Amino acid sequence: MELLGQKVKEDGVVIDERILKVDGFLNHQIDAKLMDEVGRTFYEQFKDKGITKILTIEASGIAPAIMAALHFDVPCLFAKKAKPSTLTDGYYETSIHSFTKNKTSTVIVSKEFLSEEDTVLIIDDFLANGDASLGLYDIAQQANAKTAGIGIVVEKSFQNGHQRLEEAGLTVSSLCKVASLEGNKVTLVGEE
């Protein structure tokens, strides 16, 4: 997605050789038109897979996931990082390590909203080591739901997340692939 790549290069802030900040359009302030294009692109890539639900994790995955859900005309379900007092029935849970925050969280999804009848598309904002996507895949497996694929907005291709997801047998679609953050500069795959 050329528009997304341009936005990452122009508005992304390199924190260090492993961390890219995209708060201006994805992780804090959201560019709704760009997220609409992200959702439309995921729809075009997975429209023939029988998607019944979009699955993501709070908070930064919600914007691209909700836009994808609009294009698929299906519900968007997000894993919660804390169990609310209103969740009185059963739930699926797994542990996910955040590369950016260097923190492990237990995330949950109510059994009421995910079942073996679902075919999910997992959407996430970033792919680094793949822990968030693998955690969501684990939740889908606990529900005996089918996972049609993983949609990633920004992939850091210099890390091993893509490989880990493919080794798990998952189809991965990354809309923007960052090859390097060296020299305080964003270099996309194909530009190196």
Curated annotation (Swiss-Prot):
GO terms for biological process: purine ribonucleoside salvage; xanthine metabolic process; XMP salvage. It is an enzyme of class 2 (transferase). Pathway: Purine metabolism; XMP biosynthesis via salvage pathway; XMP from xanthine: step 1/1. Homodimer. The keyword Transferase applies. Signal peptide: none annotated. Belongs to the purine/pyrimidine phosphoribosyltransferase family. Xpt subfamily. InterPro entries: PRibTrfase_dom, PRTase-like, Pur/Pyrimidine_PRTase, Xanthine_PRibTrfase. Its EC number is 2.4.2.22. This is Xanthine phosphoribosyltransferase. The keyword Repeat does not apply. It catalyses: XMP + diphosphate = xanthine + 5-phospho-alpha-D-ribose 1-diphosphate. GO terms for molecular function: xanthine phosphoribosyltransferase activity. The gene is xpt. One of its GO terms (cellular component) is cytoplasm. 5-phospho-alpha-D-ribose 1-diphosphate binds at A128, N129, G130, D131, A132. Coiled coil: none annotated. Keywords: Cytoplasm, Glycosyltransferase, Purine salvage, Transferase. It is found in: Cytoplasm. Converts the preformed base xanthine, a product of nucleic acid breakdown, to xanthosine 5'-monophosphate (XMP), so it can be reused for RNA or DNA synthesis. It comes from the Bacteria. Xanthine binds at L20, N27, K156.
